[in-house]
C-alpha cells in the first residue's frame, strides 16, 4: 500500500475528460473498499485509533487490581503510554484530561490540573469532576477545581437529583461518588453506589462497551466491593479487551457509521447492488422500541443518530413506512418547548448546530409524513451563523464538517453565488488545493472532501475549487481506496477520535460531489 499516488499535471486545455476518468476510478476504489469492509450483518464498525484517555484509565484500574494477570496488562498499557503517546492539543480541556490521565497511569506524581477556565463549561465540567475524583482516590494533589468537601457535596447532589442522564454517564457519576465517599470513610454510601453500578453491568462485564465508563466502574468496584462477581467480571472484561499493542480503544459506533456510509455511497451502482439493501436492513433492525436509533447497537436513542438514519433511509428502496413513521414520531416527541432538539435524552444537554441541522434535514426529507414544525430550528441555525460568522458542530471538529452538515437545512438557491457560509469556507482553501480542518492547519483529505461537499450544498460552483480539491483527493488516495485520516469526531467531548470508516465516508462525500458536478456539466467543471 502506498501513502498516495502522485498525479501528473494535466494541461488545462484537456482537463475535464482525464480528470473525470481519474475521479471515476477513485470512486470505484473507494466504493470497493466500502463494500469490502461491510460486515455480515450489513453494518460498518471500525476500531478507532488509540489515544491516551482509554489506555490510561484502563491501565490505572488494572494497576490497582489484585486479579491475576492485571499487573501484566497494566505494564503493557504503561509501555504504550511511555513510548510516545502525546496528549491532544486542540482544546485546553482535552490537553488537561490526557495529561492528567497519563500522569495518573504512570504514577509520575504531578498535580492533576483542572484550573483552566474552560472546565467551567457546563458540557465539560464533568471532566473536571472525574479527574478530581480519581486524583482524590489515588492521593494525588490537584490544582484548581473544587475542594474535596465541595466535590463530595456536588457529587452527592448530582446522584440524588431526579434528572435523566445517559446511562453510561450515570455509571461514571456513581463511580466518582463511590470513590469520593471512600476517601471520606463512608463505606456504606460507596457500597450503595456500587450496587447501582452493578445493576447496569452487561453479562460480559462491561458498561455499554465504553472503556472509560468500565474503567471508572472498575476503580469503584474494586475499592468498595472487592471480591464481588461484578468486580471480577469488570476486571475480566478489561483484560480481554486490551489489544495486542497494549491499548484500549474508544467505543465503536456501528449504527452511526452505517447510516453515514449508506448516505454517502448510495447511488453508486456497485454499492446499490451489493451493499445498500443489507445496510438498510441493518438500520431497520437497529431501531429502538422508542422509534429512535442509537449511535451503537444496544444503547439508548439519540436525536443525531435518529436524524442520520432517517436521512440515509430516505428515497426509493428505503425503509418500511412503519419504520420511518416511528422515527419521525420519536423526533416529534423529543422536540423541546423552544422548537429545538438536544443530542441526548439527558437533562442539561445543550442544542448544537450539527444535531439541529440533521434533524431539520431529516424532517425535510420526509415532509409528507409528519407535521413537526421546523421554522424555529431553522431560524436558530440562521441566528447562530449571523452571530458567529460560521457554524460550530458539537460532535465533529472543524469548519468543513460544520458547514457541510448544516447547509442541507437551507435553500442554497436563495443566495446568488452561493450561501455565505459556503463562500467563506471556499476562501479557506490552502495553496496545495486542499482544505484544513480549521483555517491555518495543513490540508487533510477528510477536510477537503467535506469542503467539496459543502460547496455543492451551498451552491458555490467555481470550477477552480472543484478541480483543485479533486486533485488533492486523487493525490492523497491510497491504493486500497482509502485516505489518511485525522482525529475528527468528539467523544467524549472535547476529546477527539479517529474512526477510519467515518473518515472514508466523509472524504468520499466530496469526491461524489465533484463527480456529480463534472457529469452535470458534460465533463467540464
Stretch-by-stretch model annotation:
Residues 181-197:
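Short linear, low-complexity motifs centered on an aromatic residue
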Residues 2-29, 44-75, 83-153, 161-186, ...:
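An alpha-helical repeat/solenoid feature that recognizes helix-turn-helix modules
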Residues 36-38, 240, 287:
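Assembly/interface hotspot detector across virion components, adhesins/toxins, and nucleic-acid enzymes
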Residues 30-40:
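N-terminal signal-anchor module of multipass membrane proteins
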Residues 34, 77, 81, 193, ...:
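Buried hydrophobic core positions in alpha-solenoid tandem helical repeats
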Amino acid at each position: 500500500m502506498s501513502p498516495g499516488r502522485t498525479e501528473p499535471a494535466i494541461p488545462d486545455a484537456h482537463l475535464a475528460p482525464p480528470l473525470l476518468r481519474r475521479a471515476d476510478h477513485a470512486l470505484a476504489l473507494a466504493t470497493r473498499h466500502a463494500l469490502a469492509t461491510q460486515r455480515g450483518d450489513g453494518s460498518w464498525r471500525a476500531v478507532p485509533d488509540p489515544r491516551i484517555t482509554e489506555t490510561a484509565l484502563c491501565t490505572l484500574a488494572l494497576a490497582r487490581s489484585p486479579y491475576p494477570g492485571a499487573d501484566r496488562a497494566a505494564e503493557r498499557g504503561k509501555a504504550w503510554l511511555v513510548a510516545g503517546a502525546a496528549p491532544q492539543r486542540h482544546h485546553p480541556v482535552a490537553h488537561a484530561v490526557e495529561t492528567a490521565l497519563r500522569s495518573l497511569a504512570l504514577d509520575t506524581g504531578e498535580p492533576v490540573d483542572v484550573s483552566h477556565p474552560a472546565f467551567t463549561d457546563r458540557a465539560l465540567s464533568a471532566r473536571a469532576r472525574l479527574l478530581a475524583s480519581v486524583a482524590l482516590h489515588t492521593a494525588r494533589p490537584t490544582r484548581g477545581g473544587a475542594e474535596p468537601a465541595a466535590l463530595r457535596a456536588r457529587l452527592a447532589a448530582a446522584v440524588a437529583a431526579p434528572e435523566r442522564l445517559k446511562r453510561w454517564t450515570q455509571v461514571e457519576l456513581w463511580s466518582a461518588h463511590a470513590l469520593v465517599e471512600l476517601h471520606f470513610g463512608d463505606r456504606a454510601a460507596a457500597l450503595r453506589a456500587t450496587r447501582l453500578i452493578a445493576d447496569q453491568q452487561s453479562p460480559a462485564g462491561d458498561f455499554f462497551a465504553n472503556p472509560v465508563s468500565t474503567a471508572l466502574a472498575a476503580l469503584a468496584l474494586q475499592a468498595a466491593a472487592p471480591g464481588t462477581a461484578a468486580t471480577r467480571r469488570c476486571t475480566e472484561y478489561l483484560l480481554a479487551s486490551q489489544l495486542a499493542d497494549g491499548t484500549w480503544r474508544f467505543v465503536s459506533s456501528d449504527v452511526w457509521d452505517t447510516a453515514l456510509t449508506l448516505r454517502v455511497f448510495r447511488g453508486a451502482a456497485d454499492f446499490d447492488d451489493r451493499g445498500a439493501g443489507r445496510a438498510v436492513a441493518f438500520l431497520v433492525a437497529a431501531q429502538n422500541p422508542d422509534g429512535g436509533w442509537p449511535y451503537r447497537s444496544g444503547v439508548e436513542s439519540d436525536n443525531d443518530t435518529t436524524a442520520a438514519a432517517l436521512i440515509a433511509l430516505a428515497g426509493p428502496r428505503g425503509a418500511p413506512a412503519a419504520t420511518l413513521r416511528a422515527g419521525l414520531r420519536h423526533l416529534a416527541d423529543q422536540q423541546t418547548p423552544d422548537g429545538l432538539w438536544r443530542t441526548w435524552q439527558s437533562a442539561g444537554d445543550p442544542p448544537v448546530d450539527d444535531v439541529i441541522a440533521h434533524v431539520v434535514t431529516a424532517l425535510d426529507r420526509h415532509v409528507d409524513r409528519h407535521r413537526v414544525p421546523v421554522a424555529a430550528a431553522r431560524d436558530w441555525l440562521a441566528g447562530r451563523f449571523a452571530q458567529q460568522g460560521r457554524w460550530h458542530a458539537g460532535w465533529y471538529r472543524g469548519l468543513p464538517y460544520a458547514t457541510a452538515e448544516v447547509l442541507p437545512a437551507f435553500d442554497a438557491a436563495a443566495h446568488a453565488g452561493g450561501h455565505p457560509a459556503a463562500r467563506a469556507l471556499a476562501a479557506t482553501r490552502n495553496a496545495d488545493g486542499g482544505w484544513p480542518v480549521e483555517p491555518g492547519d495543513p490540508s487533510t483529505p477528510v477536510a477537503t472532501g467535506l469542503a467539496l461537499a459543502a460547496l455543492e450544498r451551498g451552491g458555490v460552483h467555481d470550477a477552480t475549487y472543484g478541480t483543485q480539491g479533486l486533485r488533492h483527493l486523487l493525490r492523497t488516495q491510497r491504493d486500497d481506496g482509502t485516505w489518511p485520516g485525522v482525529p475528527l469526531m468528539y467523544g467524549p467531548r472535547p476529546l477527539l477520535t479517529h474512526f477510519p470508516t467515518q473518515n472514508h465516508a466523509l472524504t468520499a462525500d466530496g469526491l461524489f460531489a465533484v463527480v456529480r458536478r463534472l457529469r452535470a456539466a458534460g465533463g467540464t467543471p
